[in-house]
């Protein structure tokens, strides 16, 4: 079993979009079964999205939060779907 953990620093990094492309390529190559990320960010300026429309998203009871359009996890999942990879995932705002 392959497990991947990463502190993404997501939107705080320079060239965040380019780094996401590289990261999604690594995930495509390695295809881990389980992934855990820290510092999965989103800006406060983006509009909220309907979580029911986000691919593979599974809410956690008692930890509901408003997901925004530039949420790093949601964006990464979109990139992975383009590569034919599907993951169930959740996001807990802290």
Describe each model-derived feature in a short phrase.
Residues 1-92:
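N-terminal, active-site-proximal structural segment of metallo-dependent hydrolase catalytic domains
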